A protein has these predicted regions:
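N-terminal low-complexity regulatory segments of large eukaryotic nuclear proteins
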Residues: 1-2, 6-8, 17
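Acidic, glycine-rich two-metal-ion catalytic cores of nucleic acid-processing enzymes
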Residues: 14-63, 67-209
Length: 209
């Protein structure tokens, strides 16, 4: 999958970027996206027990991966500075297709390495369904009302924390492999709902109240 945005259907397969219509022979990829839900696809990310691509990358691909990842992160930084949300835009509309082919070619080779060298977890089906659930949660926008907090009553530290909260997308992204005990953690780019101080939790409002 090129993009995990639900409305941005696209895959890299056979050396080409394919949009809107998915190839019928797609059976393996790195991570889940909603438009793959009705297909019999396995995810290398789950085989790798949540490890990042750099952690599972074979030595002979590591240089290529570092190079394309650095350039990819530069694009993401540009979008962040320009306040362009990838929840509202498709990655393939923002990044040159030539680079996307290069990036996903390397990623596909790492993915292939994982499937060839890692055992399928005994609880793969459970992990897959759990991963799809947290994916759905990530794509639901939180109802945040920063004005509901009486700022005058907050300590200096809490005012600083509240200010920093506004840097995050109003979405919760969970890592299902975050702890050895099986508890979820928030990913670094997630709204930090699991670690929010009690004094600030009132900014989160119900969706259907």
């Amino acid at each position: 999958a090129i993009d995990d945005n639900k409305s941005c259907v696209g895959v890299y397969s056979g050396g080409e970027l394919i949009f809107n219509k998915l190839p019928e022979n797609l059976t393996k990829t790195w991570k889940y996206a909603a438009y793959l839900d009705n297909m019999d696809v396995e995810y290398a990310y789950i085989y790798a027990n949540g490890q990042q691509l750099a952690e599972v990358c074979p030595e002979h691909l590591l240089g290529d991966w570092k190079r394309v990842k650095k350039k990819f992160e530069a694009y993401l930084k540009t979008f962040q500075i320009a306040k362009v949300s990838l929840y509202d835009n498709c990655l393939y509309d923002l990044v040159p297709h030539g680079f996307l082919k290069e990036f996903f070619n390397v990623r596909n080779n790492i993915t292939k390495h994982v499937f060839e060298n890692y055992d399928k977890p005994d609880n793969y089906d459970f992990l897959s369904e759990t991963y799809k659930t947290v994916y759905d949660i990530k794509h639901q926008q939180l109802n945040i009302d920063y004005n509901s907090i009486q700022k005058a009553s907050l300590s200096h530290a809490m005012k600083g924390y509240l200010h920093n909260l506004k840097k995050y997308e109003k979405r919760c992204s969970y890592n299902i492999f975050g702890t050895k005990t099986g508890r979820f953690t928030n990913t670094p780019d997630s709204f930090p709902i699991l670690t929010m101080p009690k004094a600030l939790r009132g900014v989160i409002k119900p969706q259907n109240d």
